[in-house]
Regions:
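Coupling and communication elements adjacent to P-loop NTPase active sites across diverse families
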Residues: 1-13, 93-160, 240-357
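Conserved beta-strand
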Residues: 9-12, 19-33, 61, 353-371
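ABC ATPase nucleotide-binding domain signature region
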Residues: 31-35, 46-110, 367-450, 529-532, ...
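Conserved switch/coupling elements of ABC/ABC-like ATPase nucleotide-binding domains
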Residues: 63, 211, 224-239, 532, ...
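ABC-family P-loop ATPase nucleotide-binding domains
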Residues: 78-153, 424-494, 500
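GG-anchored amphipathic helix commonly corresponding to the ABC/SMC/Rad50 NBD signature/C-loop
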Residues: 156-176, 388-389, 477-497
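Hydrophobic anchor residue at the start of the ABC signature
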Residues: 164, 192, 483, 502, ...
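Catalytic Walker B motif of ABC-type/P-loop ATPase nucleotide-binding domains
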Residues: 175-179, 184, 495-500, 505-506
Length: 556
């Protein structure tokens, strides 16, 4: 396995202007192989990538990189006015080549093109074709082809895969990918997995995609200000951590047992000393000994008792410190255990109707769990938005299949209940100025604050977190607050609709989402490309949405 360090971190610290310090004194290295970078949301993984990429400057410490870096941020779809060429990172060179072709022979343009840039436009189009992305786009003359398409016209998955294709095209020495599988459908994920599988330089990938993390040479975990690197896949790392944690829990049990023993010995010592003191006072009262002897014995006893008290206290203090040290080595294994309100969804209760362009209807009834799958760009999110945003529900009303404003015929959906909880891909509906408690109270205004705090604690939102402004939360924390608000709504949602819920969630948060959903007793409809997640939530059906708007039930 490659062992040459491509990135070296030395006592790296970074603080934001408000004083928050996500990276504090981190040292370590990434080798020339493929490294999966994991860690809880909010531990600073994205910040660390930006520091390595040179997008941020360390507050103290240093980052040393061998060769060039290429950085793919987590959010690549925000600049909707950018072009595909911008997303690929080739716009400047292509513009220079086009200007020269139009008769502009300024020397600086030739410097931009260099020796290898003359055919970059053709190579970029070929790379997109090889990645099977934007296959339906025109790739004709310069200025009107696929490279000039606006990012705003791409689906989220198309934008991500285009950016990943740019990483391959540019071929930097060190590639840094931040959650690259977000919004990718199954085929696009396979393409990304192939990129990782065949990468020849140093590659550091932040991801919660377990399948991708099984392709790496090393796993690095950023946790509580330290970077732990393990020479193996994430699955192997999990097994190693499990062994280490069992040993740590055993050490903690031993330390706690020692502390209990030292406490007992201290108490017994105090009792013996107290008995001796009582006996001494009795002897003095009985004038059993002459006063000089009594004073000598009292002084000797006080010295001995002080020494014994000190020794017992020191032994207990050492045992208590050992417990604290052993406790720090044991990870919190927080699990969501909640008793959610009953949404009252009997088996025959109709919740929604979906209709494909072929005229087939699918009725969601009772506590069903349905996955809506399909390639990027077919309209899964649009269908969910119609489902939760359609007009007043009725028992026999179904949205009509027809052409949208863009002339594309799509499937339709209609909710048959007012009690729908919806978590979109982008959690834009959260009030950033509100506290977590106030945000959750919006959906449950009649629940007393004290009871709501208790419920939040069951969702692992505890203590000071409840009073934090929403704007200070990480992506995973924002999602957990949004999920908590939906699941604790009063009255409870009868149908829960989730659009790519595992995007931006770390592996532990995904586990907690699965746990929370296991307590939900209503109907569930979820769009996700995360096959591992879908396999864990007890699906009762899967519907595939095709490019023509047809809905097909997938055999399970």
């Amino acid at each position: 396995m490659p062992s040459t360090p491509a990135v070296v971190l030395h006592d790296l610290t970074f603080s934001w202007p408000d004083g928050a310090t996500p990276i504090a004194g981190v040292s370590g290295a990434f080798t020339a192989g493929r490294t999966g970078l994991v860690g809880l949301n909010g531990t600073g993984k994205s910040t660390l990538l930006r520091l390595v990429a040179g997008r941020l400057a360390p507050t103290t410490g240093a980052v040393a990189v061998t060769g060039t870096t290429d950085y793919l941020p987590q959010r690549v779809t925000l600049d909707t006015d950018a072009t595909v060429a911008d997303l690929l990172g080739v716009r400047r060179v292509i513009d220079a080549v086009r200007a020269i072709a139009d008769g502009d022979f300024r020397p600086e343009l030739f410097d931009v093109v260099g020796a290898d840039g003359w055919d970059l436009e053709e190579r970029a189009v070929a790379a997109l074709a090889a990645a099977d992305v934007l296959a339906g786009s025109p790739a004709g003359s310069p200025g009107g082809g696929v490279l000039d398409r606006r990012v705003g016209t791409l689906s989220g998955g198309e934008a991500v895969l285009t950016a990943v294709t740019g990483v391959r095209l540019r071929g930097a020495d060190v590639a840094l990918l931040d959650e690259p599988t977000n919004n990718l459908d199954g085929a696009a994920r396979e393409r990304l997995h192939e990129l990782v599988r065949t990468w020849r330089g140093a590659l550091v990938v932040v991801s919660h995609d377990r399948e991708l993390l099984e392709l790496v040479d090393s796993t690095a975990e950023l946790r509580t200000g330290s970077l732990t690197t393990f020479g193996g896949t994430y699955g192997q790392y999990e097994e190693w951590v499990a062994v280490q944690q069992e040993a740590a829990r055993s050490a903690l049990r031993d330390a706690e047992q020692t502390l209990r023993r030292e406490k007992r010995q201290r108490i017994e010592t105090q009792e013996r000393i107290a008995h001796s003191e009582r006996q001494g006072r009795k002897d003095a009262a009985d004038r059993k000994y002459v006063e000089a002897v009594i004073n000598d014995r009292r002084n000797a006893a006080q010295k001995s008792q002080g020494s014994r008290r000190g020794a017992a206290a020191d032994a207990e203090a050492r045992a208590r410190a050992a417990v604290a040290t052993a406790g720090r080595a044991v990870r919190d294994d927080d699990r969501i255990v909640v008793d959610l309100p009953d949404p009252d969804v009997p088996a025959g209760r109709r919740l929604a109707v979906l209709r494909g362009t072929d005229g087939r209807e699918t009725v969601l009834a009772g506590p069903v769990r349905v996955a809506l799958t399909g390639p990027n760009g077919v309209g899964k999110t649009t269908l969910l938005e119609q489902l939760v945003g359609a007009g007043a529900p009725g028992p026999d009303v179904v949205g009509s299949v027809g052409a949208g404003s863009d002339g594309v015929t799509r499937a339709s959906a209609q909710r048959l209940t007012d009690r729908v909880g919806y978590l979109p891909q982008r959690l834009d509906g959260l009030d950033d100025a509100a506290t977590v408690l106030d945000e959750v109270r919006r959906g449950a205004p009649h629940v007393p604050p004290g009871e709501l705090r208790n419920r939040l604690a069951r969702f692992l939102v505890r203590g000071d977190q409840v009073d934090r402004p929403v704007r200070t939360l990480s992506g995973g924390e924002r999602f957990r607050v949004a999920l908590t608000g939906v699941l604790l709504a009063d009255p409870p949602a009868q149908l829960l609709v989730l659009d790519e819920p595992t995007n931006n969630l770390d592996l532990a948060s995904t586990d907690q989402l699965v746990q929370a959903l296991s307590f939900y007793r209503g109907g569930l409809m979820v769009v996700s490309h995360d096959r591992g997640f879908l396999d864990r939530i007890g699906l009762t059906a899967e519907l595939a949405l095709g490019t023509g708007g047809a809905l097909t039930e997938v055999a399970r």
